[in-house]
Swiss-Prot record:
Recorded name of the encoding gene: nadE
Quaternary structure, from the entry: Homodimer.
Protein name in the entry: NH(3)-dependent NAD(+) synthetase
BP terms from Gene Ontology: NAD biosynthetic process
Job of this protein: Catalyzes the ATP-dependent amidation of deamido-NAD to form NAD. Uses ammonia as a nitrogen source.
EC number: 6.3.1.5
Amino acid sequence: MSLQNDIITALGVKSSIEPAQEIRVSVDFLKNYLNAHPFVTSLVLGISGGQDSTLTGKLCQTAITELRNETGNARYQFIAVRLPYGVQADEADCQDAIAFIQPDRVLTVNIKPAIEASEATLRAIGVELSDFVKGNEKARERMKAQYSIAGMNAGLVVGTDHAAEAVTGFFTKYGDGGTDINPIFRLNKRQGKALLRELGCPSHLYTKAPTADLEEDRPSLPDEVALGVTYEKIDDYLEGKQIEAKDAAIIENWYRKTEHKRRPPITVFDDFWR
């Protein structure tokens, strides 16, 4: 079996999907997990205004609404969390995403004061953060806030990790990669777009260039520039299509380099790294 086939199998990607069916799969997955854990009554998710959090947020709210209606338990809630670093450049998109999702609750946590305090504390002991490392600090601070909110609301922190992100390891370890449950894990980028179209999402929320926007030296850096390969090529690869050798090599290099991100902490029993 080729590495491409191994990756497709590991990430559970289908070569084609039926959007309505996949929406149902994700919603039922969330509902079934909460039904199996009755002490959990909330789903918590950071909303950035991009494709992945918009899709995941809509799936979460749908699942929670159905659970409330089916069980009569009014404690079930979806909490959308806005987590800007100061003022977000695409704040209008965030508000459009919130309007589309219609979450039960919306909380806003400005992470900038916490990041600046951490940066100053480290600087005082001689540790000066690079812009890249500071970007990862932002991702981890966002997750810290979400876990605090979840902890006070009997909740789970929901992740937006999908196959095109997982294959490249394009997430911060113990940042946006540190979640409890990932309902869109098996989908690639174009499949996520198809689900949003099916759900009636405003198109500008999933047609704009994806960006993590963590680095201040390179603001709004497109994911595809950072990765060196387009999502179109990544999606083709994940659907089993043949792509140019140079693009496949980039994807497979990212996959090998970031294997540690897709695993729990390494122990003496692990041998994938040998």
